[in-house]
């Protein structure tokens, strides 16, 4: 939620006429997007769960991934990213947010098989919102853990819902497909239940801009 908090602080500081504070928080707000875009895969838009300021592997800092996979994969920490960026887009109309959401929505809609960009770099599509699973490497390849049946297999609301919200930056037809899929899912755990509620509030227009 960092970018939303920073945006709200920005608006309040501007209204107060505190230009020094406004400049400080404005830089912080855009730095969040800078880090996000440095780390995001150039085609899929998928991001690490944890990264450093330059969008690279984290060093000399603490990160906890034992409950959901590796720091450099799109797992249960990272899956919240499209939801957060969607909130910035629908509340404030941020163009960087829109562009990012459109990129990650293209990943969701792309065929699931291996594909290559103009430089010969391999990547994989999500296969449509109905085929989204609960763990990926950032190039779109499913991250399947053979010792734990959940990862890379479950059609989990934590992932599906966040991607569904990202569709709000695309077109109505895609939104309808994604939201219909979201409406069919039930959460199995506390974490997913919490995210499912938050996703549904935003999808239904009940997660209001506080300003």
Which ranges hold each PLM region?
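Terminal, non-catalytic domain-edge segments
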Residues: 82-91, 162, 166-211
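Extended ligand-binding clefts on enzyme/binding-domain cores
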Residues: 1-161, 165-170
């Amino acid at each position: 939620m960092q970018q939303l908090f920073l945006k709200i602080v920005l608006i309040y500081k501007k209204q107060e006429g505190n230009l020094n504070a406004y400049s400080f928080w404005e830089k912080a707000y855009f730095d969040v997007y800078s880090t996000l875009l440095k780390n995001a895969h150039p085609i899929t838009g998928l991001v690490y769960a944890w990264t450093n300021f330059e969008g690279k592997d984290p060093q000399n800092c603490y990160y906890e991934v034992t409950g959901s996979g590796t720091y450099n994969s799109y797992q249960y920490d990272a899956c919240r990213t499209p939801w957060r960026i969607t909130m910035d887009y629908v509340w404030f109309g941020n163009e960087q947010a829109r562009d990012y959401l459109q990129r990650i929505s293209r990943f969701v809609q792309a065929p699931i098989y291996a594909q290559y960009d103009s430089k010969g770099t391999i990547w994989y599509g999500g296969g449509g919102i109905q085929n989204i699973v609960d763990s990926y490497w950032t190039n779109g390849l499913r991250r399947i853990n053979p010792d734990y049946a959940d990862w890379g297999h479950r059609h989990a609301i934590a992932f599906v819902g966040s991607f569904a919200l990202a569709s709000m930056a695309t077109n109505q037809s895609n939104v309808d497909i994604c939201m219909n899929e979201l409406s069919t899912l039930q959460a199995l755990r506390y974490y997913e239940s919490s995210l499912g509620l938050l996703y549904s509030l935003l999808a239904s227009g009940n997660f209001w801009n506080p300003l």
